[in-house]
């Protein structure tokens, strides 16, 4: 296959022979729904997982509107997104995001603050259609 994408309510696994736009939804944060990642073609599986303390039914011990983690191992992307969402703040971002791990990159949103770390796909302006957002 040349293209495969599985989306399970904020957790995405993909490989693709073309660019794929992935909208960034962060609840009531000012940037929510206004930007998307442009994920370039992937010959290997890429996990893109999001956790939120303010969106959805999952229990979170944090305050972030969205923590998006990228990893070649989708289970690691999911685990890191959940773990980081439980503890991340604008003040501690650089201290809690690991520099050496299976993560490719982290994109975090908390209110009007955005933090990034590692290698991330290009972020472009977008008009994310809320009707296309999957529910886990």
Spans of model-derived segments:
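Mature catalytic core of soluble alpha/beta enzymes
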Residues: 1-136
